[in-house]
Regions:
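Transmembrane helix-loop-helix hairpins at membrane boundaries of multipass inner-membrane proteins
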Residues: 1-44, 117-134
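Juxtamembrane/interfacial segments at transmembrane-helix boundaries in multi-pass membrane proteins
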Residues: 1-5, 102-164, 169, 194-212, ...
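Structural signature of hydrophobic alpha-helical transmembrane segments
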Residues: 10-19, 60-73, 143-156, 204-219
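Hydrophobic residues within membrane-embedded alpha-helical segments of Major Facilitator Superfamily
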Residues: 15, 22, 46, 53, ...
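Central hydrophobic cores of alpha-helical transmembrane segments in multi-pass inner-membrane proteins
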Residues: 16-30, 47-49, 70-80, 149, ...
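Helix-loop junctions at the membrane interface of multi-pass solute transporters
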Residues: 28-36, 75-84, 152, 161-171, ...
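The feature identifies polytopic integral membrane transport proteins across all domains of life
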Residues: 38, 58-61, 89-94, 142-151, ...
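Alpha-helical multi-pass transmembrane bundles of energy-transducing inner-membrane proteins
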Residues: 39, 43-46, 50-133, 138, ...
Length: 264
């Protein structure tokens, strides 16, 4: 139990520090915003609240609430202060993220009802694997179904191929400060969620999907690099390079499982 609490802190602390630094920079980058500056900075602070809340929550209900709190500020920041295609970019981001949120909500409710009607992440971590042993839904292992639902929810945020198409447009159309936050923090939230939820709570299912994660990560690396090479727009270049970088993160997470197998 204590190790897992330390694990949460070790994962969360550097991300909270990174969030504070990038939002501090984002405020200065946005200092010359002329269109509704009060609304802009209010949404920026609300986005900051959602991100920090996700990193610090040990309750699944709060984790999900803060995850959703991030959605609306990003939608309005892109849709109101973005570039020429800002509305299309904002709607595409909203729809992709909404689909992931629905998947995550179904998985969270499934864990709630199978783990003693609790949202406490430590308790779920300790009981999920035991309570889900032998449980089948639609002819499939319940633990695998829940793992896949959570994976899709987080993979859209990473983003993992083929859920990556919202990122280049959102990155290009977003204001510069939001592009910095998008590349610097928001994409990492997906990888953070995979480590904190999928890996920590459902470790038995990870063994089944490590190979698929490695393949998806490899596709991200190759596709992101090739697309980045073809870009002339700096923001698009950063967007595709971010897809490439997160592919390495996916491969790294899969490699942890492979290393565990080799070491017994």
């Amino acid at each position: 139990l204590e190790f897992r609490r330390v694990l949460f802190r070790s994962l969360s602390l550097p991300m909270v520090v990174l969030t504070a630094i990038l939002f501090f920079i984002g405020v200065f980058v946005s200092w010359n915003i002329e269109k509704a500056p009060k609304g802009y900075f209010a949404l920026l602070l609300l986005l900051d609240t959602g991100i920090v809340g996700v990193f610090l929550s040990l309750d699944f209900f709060l984790f999900y609430v803060f995850w959703e709190v991030m959605l609306l500020p990003m939608y309005f920041l892109i849709g109101m202060w973005g570039g020429p295609q800002r509305e299309y970019a904002a709607i595409k981001f909203f729809l992709y993220t909404l689909v992931g949120s629905v998947m995550m909500l179904i998985a969270i409710l499934a864990l709630y009802f199978t783990c003693g009607h609790t949202f406490d992440m430590i308790t779920i971590m300790e009981t999920a694997s035991t309570n889900l042993v032998g449980v089948s839904w639609w002819g499939m292992d319940a633990i695998k179904v829940i793992w896949v639902l959570l994976f899709i929810g987080f993979a859209i945020k990473v983003p993992v191929f083929p859920f990556h198409t919202w990122l280049p447009l959102a990155h290009v159309e977003a204001p510069t400060a939001i592009s910095v936050i998008l590349a610097g923090i928001l994409l990492k939230l997906g990888a953070y969620g995979l480590l904190r939820v999928n890996y920590s709570m459902l470790p038995d299912a990870v063994w089944w999907f490590a190979g698929a994660m490695a393949i998806l990560g490899l596709i991200n690396v190759i596709w992101g690099a090739l697309c980045a090479l073809a870009q002339t727009d700096l923001k698009k270049l950063v967007a595709y390079s971010s897809i490439n970088h997160m592919g390495y993160a996916m491969i790294g997470m899969a490699a942890v499982i492979a290393a565990g197998e080799m070491n017994g």
